[in-house]
Amino acid sequence: MVLVDTSIWISHLRDNRPALVELLNQVSVACHPFVTGELALGNLKNRREILTSLERLPTSEIATHQEVLEFIEARALMGKGLGLIDIHLLASAKLSSIPFWTQDQRLLKAVTDLGIDYSET
């Protein structure tokens, strides 16, 4: 199972990423409600179909507000240019013990530092 970041989904919806298609076919993709929410804010072709498909994917564990605050402190994630949604996704991947796939450079550094990075190979 892999938690897939919004940046990967956007890339996939524009250009079709074969590695993501393979993971989807293997039922190995987890989603987070914040990723679905971020995508819902964009202009999507086949909007309802895409959002419904995302909602049908397995969901990663969802960190509570308190867990996120503790996660920030425990891993010294303040001042790294990450947003609250980024931290929620990192915490969820860590709580779920699954890798996190992103192409956002700041987020990728944090994911790599936490040892939960996913690389399409």
Q: For each predicted feature, which ranges?
A:
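Short, well-structured N-terminal submotif of metal-dependent ribonuclease cores
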Residues: 1-31, 40-52, 119
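Short, acidic/turn-prone active-site loops that include or flank metal/cofactor-
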Residues: 34-36, 56-58, 106
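Active-site neighborhoods of divalent-metal-dependent phosphate/nucleic-acid chemistry enzymes
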Residues: 12, 18, 59-121
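A generic, residue-level signal for flexible/boundary positions that often mark functional hotspots
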Residues: 7, 54, 76-79
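A generic structural signal for short hydrophobic patches within well-formed alpha-helices
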Residues: 9, 36-39, 107-108
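Amphipathic alpha-helical segments within well-ordered protein domains
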Residues: 36-40, 51-55, 69, 73, ...
